[in-house]
Regions:
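Intrinsically disordered, low-complexity regulatory segments
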Residues: 1-110, 114-118, 141
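Prokaryote-biased recognition of long, low-complexity C-terminal linker/tail segments
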Residues: 113-167
Length: 167
C-alpha cells in the first residue's frame, strides 16, 4: 500500500541522530554547516575544490543549495595533490556553470539510488516479513560478489599442483 515511495519534492536535511527524544539534528553537522555558511557569507569569491568528479560536485552543490547561497563560484579541477597540479588548476579555474551537467547527473543518480533502495527494501521487507534486509544499487551486487567468493572458498577442494619424484 505504501509503495512506491516518491517524495515530492526531494528535500535535503542535515544529518539526523537517534536520541531518546527521537531523531534530532546532529549537533556537529549543524555546527559545521553554520561555519561554512558564515565563510560563504563573508567571502568575495568562492572556489570549489571538492573531489574532481560527480560526487565532489554533488557535495558542494548540496551544501551551497542548503545554505541558500547565490554567489557565483569557480571550479578548481585537479586529480593530483602535487604542487604543480594544484598551481595548474588554480591557473585554469572554470566557471561553476560549466559543471551543471555533472551536478545534474550526480543529483539524478543520488535520487535514483534513494528511490530504488527505499522502495526495493520496503518491498523485500513486506515480501519476506523481515525488516532487516535492504537492497541498494551498489550494496546488492557487492554483497552478491562477497557471497559468491564465500561459497567458492567454502567449496574449495585442495588439489596438488605438482608431485615430487626422486630419480
Amino acid at each position: 500500500e505504501d509503495l512506491p515511495m516518491i517524495p515530492d519534492p526531494f528535500r535535503l536535511v542535515v544529518r539526523q541522530v537517534r536520541t531518546d527524544r527521537g531523531m534530532v539534528t546532529d549537533i556537529a553537522a549543524g555546527r559545521q554547516l553554520k561555519v561554512i555558511g558564515e565563510v560563504l557569507a563573508g567571502c568575495e569569491s568562492i572556489i570549489v575544490a571538492t573531489d574532481a568528479g560527480r560526487e565532489g560536485e554533488l557535495i558542494f552543490r548540496w551544501i551551497y543549495s542548503h545554505l541558500g547561497c547565490t554567489k557565483l563560484f569557480k571550479r578548481l579541477w585537479f586529480s593530483s595533490l602535487t604542487d604543480e597540479a594544484i598551481r595548474k588548476g588554480m591557473a585554469d579555474l572554470r566557471e561553476g556553470y560549466e559543471y551543471d551537467s555533472l551536478y545534474a547527473a550526480a543529483d539524478s543518480r543520488a535520487k535514483a539510488d534513494w528511490l530504488v533502495g527505499m522502495n526495493a527494501s520496503r518491498a523485500l521487507a513486506t515480501a519476506s516479513g523481515s525488516a532487516n534486509n535492504s537492497i541498494g544499487r551498489v550494496q546488492t551486487p557487492t554483497l552478491a560478489m562477497i557471497c559468491a567468493r564465500f561459497k567458492e572458498n567454502r567449496n574449495f577442494v585442495s588439489t596438488p599442483y605438482w608431485q615430487l619424484h626422486i630419480t
